[in-house]
Design a protein with these regions (language model features):
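Contiguous, well-ordered alpha-helical segments that form the cores/surfaces of helical PPI scaffolds
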Residues: 232, 300, 505-518, 538, ...
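Amphipathic, well-packed alpha-helical segments that form the structural scaffold of globular domains
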Residues: 23, 458, 462, 513-517
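Conserved catalytic cores of very large enzyme subunits
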Residues: 89-93, 99-501, 522, 526-688, ...
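Conformational switch/transducer regions in large eukaryotic molecular machines and scaffolds
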Residues: 14, 677, 699-702
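Metallocofactor- and cofactor-centric catalytic cores in central/energy metabolism, strongly enriched
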Residues: 272-276, 280, 518, 712-718
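Charged, amphipathic alpha-helical regulatory modules used
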Residues: 1-110, 717-722
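Long insertion/accessory domains within large nucleic-acid-processing enzymes
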Residues: 684-723
Length: 723
């Protein structure tokens, strides 16, 4: 069994240390108040037994809490007082220097929590370590100076999660939709250099990758671009290539316009291939100031095209994008594997969902790609037009910002809908499970605590908003001055765009499944559980609507994709409430409104049920189904896609995509338990070295490739198939 030290390092549990610590406290009291050596040894044994039953690595603080409880149970109150006083004094010493140990442990790669915090960051790399070092300083400043104590306390107890405190010290926003069209058509400035409108498709792709990198370095959340904004440059290249071909072949006999066009189209396809390849490889190899590849989503929506020519050219780009993602990228052994980025989103619409539709061939290619590489994910134009309705009563279809955060419909001062160039200010998530358990099955008490926690979240969200208020455009010129989001003057504040619905700010929620079960012993898949779950969702929306009306700030409800935080919430719940069957008996809690990963339910029933909850998450949410290897059953994949089109706005299919670099095995790398810890192992050769295997799993909308903490790993291990 292992424990996690305060600096994040993971070490073997040693019961002798408990005996030594209690003995020191025991020796400092009068003889009549002392415990016997047998009592002290029994305490160490009981703590070890309780820790083993937790099925995860406990922190030093949790072990010490158990020791305190056991001493009190022995009624050795004087010993307990000395033990608690010693802990308190040590805590004061540690508090005087809050970051040194954390920073040193991550530099020396001893910090297990940091190693497993982000499934797309490699914590052994210098650039990532620099980002983590800055993050530790930011978290320290945020905790001691920038946030009210009540918010810090609630965050530390796992009552709420104040997202991205490692960036909160700076005036940075979360995620956005990049206005690539404006930047390419009207020019932009990158690092003080004027970039004019490109004169070819390949140049447009190159500029796009530079924009992606610059944007990623100026924010902490994801970004999305649309292939539609690149489509006009296909015809620019077409006309340019035609002129060149005509000049080359003009002296040859029998050269017709038809032959010129045929040669030109062949060269055009080669340029499209190079351009898309450039985006794929640049995105996975670029390193931003965040110490990672840009978290970027590429949107593929035929309905965005302005005319038939642009639509046909967009189809060419989409086709090439899907082909290249299906192929994958080579790992260091030269083997084709699944890349994490860019995330791809494909819109299902009338012109591509039916077998006799014009672009059905693209949908079949998308299904083939999903079965092998887990992308693209799917948006239903049909359902989104029903869910995203603006103040004029018009429905809209558009992409999320990065993983799943959706803007709310917005009409500008000219009466036109606007999505590209807008952003999200940040997220605070409520732990619904904690409210449910705190109520102790009393519904009146539940709603009282719910109201109190909502106001706590509101104050935390106001802190996020206030941190951005007064931010000048100079903080991130690529965003605020040169078109990625806006074109403000130098020194101009962004305040106007924090109000009026231009940007959103998100109230996140997690653990609806466990919350409902803790209250009424019913699952979301049962009628009573579903009804209560939907009631809670409607109540959450009532609060965001109330805040929005009062402050003219676009508060929106968001289905939080917990990554490392799922483990933190689970540990906090176990500490506060103990182990409760079907609620706190795992090292993770369920994301947003999702059906529990262990629930036996088929794909269609799951999507149909979750669609009701997704419609009540206007700030973003995504549903998924877990499937086996479907590469030889694409018709089944297509049937799920057709169901998505008719029933749910945004969904994805999860499969596995692994490779062992030791033996070449390309089946599923499995999760084993070893000495209380979950580890990854090749079932063919027994390789357990994570640096010598490629494992890709859906983590929270994105694909993760750098492994996960113990809570998320347990969740991945316990996922059941839905198809």
């Amino acid at each position: 069994m292992k424990i996690i030290k305060r600096n994040g390092a993971e070490v073997l549990f040693d019961p002798q240390k408990i005996i030594v610590a209690i003995t020191k406290a025991n020796d400092s009291v009068v003889p009549s108040a002392r415990m016997t050596p047998i009592q002290i040894k029994r305490i160490a044994e009981d703590v070890e037994s309780a820790a083993l039953n937790m099925n995860r690595a406990l922190s030093v603080e949790e072990i010490q809490d158990m020791v305190e409880d056991q001493i009190m149970n022995q009624r050795a109150f004087d010993v307990a007082r000395r033990y608690i006083t010693y802990r308190y004094n040590r805590a004061l010493i540690r508090k005087s220097n809050t970051t040194d140990e954390q920073i040193m442990s991550l530099i020396e790669c001893n910090n297990e929590e940091v190693k497993q915090e982000n499934s797309n960051k490699n914590p052994t790399v210098n650039s990532v370590q620099r980002d983590y070092m800055a993050g530790e300083v930011s978290k320290d400043i945020t905790k001691r100076i920038l946030l009210p104590k009540e918010i810090v306390s609630a965050h530390e107890q796992g009552i709420i999660h104040f997202h991205d405190s490692d960036y909160f010290a700076q005036h940075m926003h979360n995620c956005d939709l990049v206005n690539l069209e404006d930047m390419l058509q009207n020019g932009t400035v990158i690092s003080g250099t004027m970039i004019e409108k490109p004169h070819s498709f390949s140049t447009a792709c190159n500029i796009a990758t530079q924009i992606i990198a610059q944007v990623a370095s100026c924010q902490y959340g994801g970004q999305s671009i649309s292939l539609t904004h690149l489509a006009p440059f296909v015809d620019v290249s077409r006309q340019k290539i035609r002129r060149l071909v005509r000049d080359e072949l003009s002296d040859l006999p029998g050269i017709t316009e038809e032959k010129i066009n045929a040669v030109a189209e062949k060269r055009l396809h080669e340029e499209i291939e190079r351009g898309i390849q450039m985006i794929q490889y640049q995105v996975v190899t670029l390193m931003t100031t965040n110490g990672q590849a840009p978290f970027v989503t590429v949107f593929m929506y035929l309905g965005e095209a302005k005319n038939e020519r642009e639509r046909a050219d967009l189809a060419l780009i989409i086709e090439e994008t899907l082909k290249q993602r299906y192929k994958g990228v080579k790992n260091e052994k030269g083997v084709w594997v699944t890349p994490a980025f860019p995330k791809l989103i494909y819109v299902l619409e009338e012109d591509n969902i039916h077998e006799d539709s014009q672009y059905y061939y693209l949908t079949k290619l998308a299904a083939k790609c999903t079965a092998k590489r887990m992308v693209p994910d799917y948006i239903s134009e049909k359902i989104m037009l029903q869910n995203k309705i603006d103040k004029n009563g018009e429905g809209h279809c558009y992409t999320c910002m990065g993983c799943r955060s959706f803007l709310t419909p917005y009409v500008d001062e000219n009466g036109k809908p606007k999505y590209y160039g807008r952003f999200n200010q940040g997220v605070v998530t409520i732990n619904l499970v904690d409210i449910g358990l705190s109520a102790d099955k009393n519904m009146d008490r539940f709603w009282e605590i719910f109201d109190e926690r909502m106001e706590l979240c509101h104050r935390a969200l106001q802190c996020r908003h206030d941190r951005l208020t007064g931010t000048l455009s100079d903080a991130a010129p690529i965003l605020w001055q040169h078109g990625a989001l806006l074109r403000l003057e130098k020194g101009e504040p962004i305040d106007k765009y924090l109000h009026g619905g231009y940007s959103t700010i998100s109230l996140g929620y997690a653990g609806l499944w466990e919350c409902v079960y803790s209250l009424i012993d019913r699952k979301l898949t049962e009628p009573e559980g579903e009804a209560l779950g939907l009631e809670i969702m409607r109540k959450l929306n009532e609060y965001t609507a109330k805040w929005k009306k009062a402050e003219n700030i676009d508060y929106s409800l968001y289905g939080t994709p917990l990554e490392s935080t799922t483990y933190k919430f689970a540990k906090c719940l176990q500490k506060r409430f103990g182990i409760i069957k079907n609620v706190t008996d795992r090292s993770y809690i369920t994301n947003s409104y999702h059906i529990h990963v262990t629930e036996e339910i088929d794909a269609f029933e799951k999507l149909a049920l979750e669609s009701k909850f997704q419609a009540l998450s206007p700030g973003g949410a995504i549903s998924y189904v877990e499937v086996p290897n479907m590469q030889n059953n694409l018709e089944a994949v297509l049937s799920v896609m057709r169901f998505i089109y008719d029933n749910i706005m945004y969904a994805e299919l999860n499969t596995k995509s692994d490779y062992c670099q030791v033996c070449g095995y390309d089946g599923e790398i499995e999760i084993r338990e070893d000495d209380g810890k979950l580890i990854w192992e090749c079932p063919n050769c027994g390789n357990r070295d994570q640096s010598k295997m490629n494992v890709a799993r859906r983590t929270c909308g994105y694909i993760g490739t750098q492994f996960w903490n113990q809570g998320r790993t347990q969740e991945i291990k316990e996922r059941v198939l839905h198809l």
